[in-house]
Amino acid sequence: MKNNDKLDSHTPMMQQYLRLKAQHPEILLFYRMGDFYELFYSDAKRASQLLDISLTKRGASAGEPIPMAGVPYHSIENYLTKLVQLGESAAICEQIGDPATSKGPVERKVVRIVTPGTISDEALLQERQDNLLAAIWQDAKGFGYATLDISSGRFRVAEPADLETMAAELQRTNPAELLYPENFEPMSLIEHRHGLRRRPLWEFELDTAKQQLNLQFGTRDLIGFGVEQAHLALRAAGCLLQYVKDTQRTSLPHIRGLTMERQQDGIIMDAATRRNLELTQNLSGGSENTLAAILDCSVTPMGSRMLKRWLHMPIRDIRVLTDRQQAIGGLQDIAAELQTPLRQVGDLERILARLALRTARPRDLARMRHAFQQLPEIHRLLQPIDVPHVQNLLSQVSQFDELQDLLERAIVETPPVLVRDGGVIASGYNAELDEWRALADGATDYLDRLEIREREKLGLDTLKVGFNGVHGYYIQVSRGQSHLVPIHYVRRQTLKNAERYIIPELKEYEDKVLTSKGKALAIEKGLYEEIFDLLLPHLPELQLSANALAELDVLANLAERAETLNYSCPTLSDKPGIKIMGGRHPVVEQVLKEPFISNPLTLSPQRRMLIITGPNMGGKSTYMRQTALIVLLAHMGSYVPADQATIGPIDRIFTRVGAADDLASGRSTFMVEMTETANILHNATEQSLVLMDEIGRGTSTYDGLSLAWACAENLASRIKAMTLFATHYFELTTLPEKMEGVANVHLDALEHGETIAFMHSVQEGAASKSYGLAVAALAGVPRDVIKRARQKLKELESLSNNAAASTIDGSQMTLLNEEIPPAVEALEALDPDSLSPRQALEWIYRLKNMV
């Protein structure tokens, strides 16, 4: 039986529940029942599994037992956090009617909907990570993509041209929740993601989207945002905005504009590159030993989030990058001092979002007040800094003296968590509130006086006055003296050793006190809403200030990191090439216990490709990755881990580094490797930086060497990209002799007996040998296996040396040794002196057949 079949056969309470559930069929409905939120039917079963709570039954309705699960109302946020992390959504249904006046079930309604992408509550968010809601649209023209961070109001759109670019955007933004149309075709792109929401096609209708967006921004058209013709992106943005309005059920004044993100504005990195460079997530899925882990010592959560956005979106605008470099240089002397007041500013960005949604809690307002109190000190520290970008940011940080004064007068020093707890509004702010509070607070004095008076008047030494949450105020007398109480004492409660009474005077006072407490709380709630009304008109300036403070935090952090980690300011040139003196890997140098060996690198139009050889563990991958990371850091405006660096124009960074089977998609290591290689060969340009590590190792020697040769040749001669090409195929070291713009470098090692010492130093020229067996021994491969391998190596080297010299050129090359025909192998194995005449004749026929 479906839950809503034959509604009339259910109890009135279950009828109410089923009507509400019908409005939210796809998400869990938490239905308030006294001190619990309860879930019924299929919701109860799902919640029991997801939240690990007991599944029970609650009586019967329509003749069937009702599956039920529940959580205490005061623990709801903990359970919502777990649901959100699992990509689930929930509707919170509260009692809004008065039980005393209700006929039948108390009136209830859904007051908020919690989804992974629309949360703004501090308890549900990770403070140092963006939490994005996204929507995707796809048709024959390409993709439309929109993201919104409801906790900041940051609204972005893009139009990725193809599947690879869309995959890179999804990895970069990593949305907590993704809306997609019901006819979406490339499901392989999104099917493994959490928080997927299938939406009807009409929600992506273009005209409706434009209308919704103009209504939100208070504009007649979208030309001012530069998105009027971005039809694919606008479809996604319209669906996203409607979804937010449906779930938040309030106005969204902090969402005030839309920004178009264009590929050409930044350095493009595909999904594989972001993963391989371990910017914010390591290859194991954690955050340890990533670039962000080393670079992010920001003192505010909003600064930390901005830094990670910069890491994932390196830009090409030299003017902006120069501004950032100059700001970092200007802040180095005061970075530590500036971080002290910035730390006290806290997460102003998200507090303002909760203010806009009218969900800010008392402690949010106290934190806002504390942030305002830091602004004069920030101004004092920054005013002497003669750097245009610093002064521009400072001009965006207003000093909100009036708002600070309002919050200092209105909010107590240490407010409670919730307004409903009372005691949020400070004494002296509102005379009427003070009067009602005085009445409620005077209860203690009155009760003390009443107790003394009654005890002396009646001569009952066990008499005392108290309060109980269930029965209210009472006069308690021991059982032994209860027969002495006067007739106007009305029994209210009997205990084992005492009786409790009420008298008209106490009852009258009880009504007065309870009324005063209720009245005081009602006035407080009204005043709290009024404070919102006084703050909200200043929201645009507040958001501008919060954004500027976040950027100042990022720049001060980068200044501190540059000083502490010995980074230098790179030169950004308009001439092609990369020249690095004393370059270091920013993460590896911090993790290593021994000193990191720095290395130079030169790429130019005359030296476009480096063929990198050397032993495993010698540092080839580190050398390649550090180059990409130095380029990336330079294009986010940061100083870099090098003695000196000059970086020319870069449009893309590609990495083909390492690989593993993609079991989820049914792709082998080699297939993953070739897919990434194809992407590079199709999309790289002269201004791209390409890292190719051990290409072709996932197949046979001949196939692998052929592919590696052809790829290197293509990158060097046709594409002319700046390429670092690490390989174990020593045949490739002859490429510089045959092609212009190609050079050999190697990482050296010293072998002593069966031990090996890696020098980690990059030298010009090709490596002399591979040291593979020494590395195997170092890894713990048994000695007898190493010994047998050395024997086999000598045999193979002997065969190779005795064979005809290989001739390798671009059109035809002999790879290692030609394959030996079976007839030749048979002849080599034959001992003619041991054959009889008959056997010799048989061998002639056999060899004839082989040939």
Curated annotation (Swiss-Prot):
GO terms for biological process: mismatch repair. This is DNA mismatch repair protein MutS. The gene is mutS. This protein is involved in the repair of mismatches in DNA. It is possible that it carries out the mismatch recognition step. This protein has a weak ATPase activity. SUPFAM superfamilies: DNA repair protein MutS, domain I (SSF55271), DNA repair protein MutS, domain II (SSF53150), DNA repair protein MutS, domain III (SSF48334), P-loop containing nucleoside triphosphate hydrolases (SSF52540). ATP binds at G614, P615, N616, M617, G618, G619, K620, S621. GO terms for molecular function: ATP binding; ATP-dependent DNA damage sensor activity; damaged DNA binding; mismatched DNA binding. Keywords: ATP-binding, DNA damage, DNA repair, DNA-binding, Nucleotide-binding. It holds the Pfam family MutS_V. InterPro entries: DNA_mismatch_repair_MutS, DNA_mismatch_repair_MutS-lik_N, DNA_mismatch_repair_MutS/MSH, DNA_mismatch_repair_MutS_C, DNA_mismatch_repair_MutS_clamp, DNA_mismatch_repair_MutS_core, DNA_mismatch_repair_MutS_N, DNA_mismatch_repair_MutS_sf. It comes from Yersinia pseudotuberculosis serotype O:3 (strain YPIII). GO terms for cellular component: cytosol. PANTHER family: DNA MISMATCH REPAIR PROTEIN MSH1, MITOCHONDRIAL, DNA MISMATCH REPAIR PROTEIN MUTS FAMILY MEMBER. Belongs to the DNA mismatch repair MutS family. It comes from the Bacteria.
